[in-house]
Amino acid sequence: MPSQKKILVVTQHFWPENFRINDIVEGFLQDGIAVDVLCGLPNYPKGEWFPGYSAAGPFEEEWHGARLYRCKEVPRRGNTSVNIFLNYVSWPWYAAHALHRLPGGYDAVFCFNTSPVLMCWPAIRYAKKHHIPFTNYVLDIWPENLYSVLNVKNKALRAIAQGVSDALYKKADRLIAMSEPLQQRLCQRTGMPPQK
């Protein structure tokens, strides 16, 4: 009898926040796949902790049979440019430094990559260290999405943001896009064939 497959899902936003990744994880579980989720502390969209959550946790929970490993993040309080920026960089940093908390034994890593593109950094680190495939489900393309939130006019900063974004997208073994135009744009940016 084959052993049960096990997936690590990496996503800043997860239940009780209302994102499609909740349904995707339920689908994995219904297919008999064991799932651990590395996620943040719920505060989206208002930047206020959901009831029962705070900067002090909880950092481990169970949801429908999936084990949740929550990481710290700076909440988006007030949705100011500064707080959004701090939220964008804090969660990937804390998540990348919490990988040692995970029990391991995963067959693959699946990242639900909303903004920022940096969210996939912990997934890349884990997949590379453990030599397992990494799938990046891309919802927002960067740095274009960044420019819709922050007014970045400096050409050097824009070039750096483009280079970092492209490098992170190229680290995936498989890219999944939300739409056909987004898939075409990712293929154009990364040089990956459409079936990837």
Predicted features along the sequence, with ranges:
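An aromatic- and histidine-rich active-site surface loop
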Residues: 18, 85-96, 108-145
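Helix-loop-beta element that forms the nucleotide-linked donor phosphate-binding surface
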Residues: 176-177, 183-196
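N-terminal subdomain of nucleotide-sugar transferases
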Residues: 1-64
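Hydrophobic anchor at the start of a short beta-strand
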Residues: 35, 134, 194-195
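Short beta-strand scaffold positions
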Residues: 111, 177-178
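Membrane-proximal helix-turn-helix segments that form the acceptor-binding/catalytic region
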Residues: 118, 125-130, 155-177
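Structural motif
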Residues: 6, 107-108, 174
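A conserved catalytic-core segment of Leloir-type glycosyltransferases
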Residues: 39-103
